[in-house]
């Protein structure tokens, strides 16, 4: 199945090449989940336990709400307009002041109607050459399968070093898809620093489990 999110750095096109390379394992962990394309594309029977993690609390809240409160989430969209004014209203809201469901609705709306699914500084965009990215009449249909797929998935919100430490065991497989070198700030300020590449390398050099990392091929890496 497909991910329900358009998200910067998503692996929609590379998933078919990555998944066959995943070794046998018991526990599957996506450390930088983003749109979680590998999770959604792979056969869930490959793993006895599945965990997705992301440092972005808005994103994690969206996953948790779609998993646990889909009906309430969908209900909100009955009163929402697809318009620039509505986009700007959502954009100006403080996520911390909202309920989890409101926060998830806000983030999903901004992702769907924002230019290039930007996390940092989203701007309103309408495609003139394709169908609307957010069809209010089909949200329930589109998200029902996602709701079922997430039913057995643990959803975490930790720093990558804490995730690697918590779940590292010989039978764990980590899929690691950090921000690409040179794009560290695309996902927000203070989320990932250039020094994190070296820290990540040092941690991965000493784990018990196995991993695949997606990263751009540049001399610095």
Regions found by a protein language model. Give the residues of each.
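Alpha-helix N-cap and loop-to-helix initiation/capping positions
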Residues: 191-195
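SAM cofactor-binding core of SAM-dependent methyltransferases
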Residues: 20-94
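Conserved beta-strand signature within the Rossmann-like core of class I S-adenosyl-L-methionine
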Residues: 209-214
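SAM-dependent nucleic-acid methyltransferase catalytic core
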Residues: 1-14, 21-22, 67-189, 199-202, ...
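Short, polar loop motifs at secondary-structure junctions
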Residues: 33-37, 142-143, 215-219
């Amino acid at each position: 199945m497909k991910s329900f999110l358009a998200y910067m750095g998503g692996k929609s096109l590379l998933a078919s090449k990555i998944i066959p390379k995943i070794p046998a394992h018991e526990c599957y962990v996506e450390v930088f989940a983003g749109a979680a394309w590998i999770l959604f594309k792979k056969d869930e029977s490959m793993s006895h336990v599945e965990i997705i993690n992301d440092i972005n609390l808005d994103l994690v809240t969206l996953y948790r709400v779609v998993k646990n409160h889909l009906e309430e989430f969908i209900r909100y969209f009955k009163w929402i307009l697809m318009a620039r004014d509505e986009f700007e209203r959502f954009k100006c809201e403080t996520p911390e002041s909202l309920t989890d469901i409101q926060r998830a609705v806000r983030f999903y709306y901004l992702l769907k109607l924002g230019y290039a699914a930007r996390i940092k500084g989203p701007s309103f965009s309408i495609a003139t050459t394709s169908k609307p990215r957010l069809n209010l009449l089909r949200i329930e249909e589109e998200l029902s399968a996602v709701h079922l797929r997430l039913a057995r998935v643990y959803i975490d919100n930790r720093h990558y070093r804490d995730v690697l430490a918590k779940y590292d065991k010989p039978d764990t497989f980590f899929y690691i898809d950090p921000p690409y070198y040179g794009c560290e700030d695309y996902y927000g300020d203070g989320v990932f620093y250039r020094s994190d590449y070296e820290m990540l390398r040092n941690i991965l050099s000493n784990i018990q489990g196995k991993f695949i990392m997606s990263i751009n091929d540049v001399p610095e890496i």
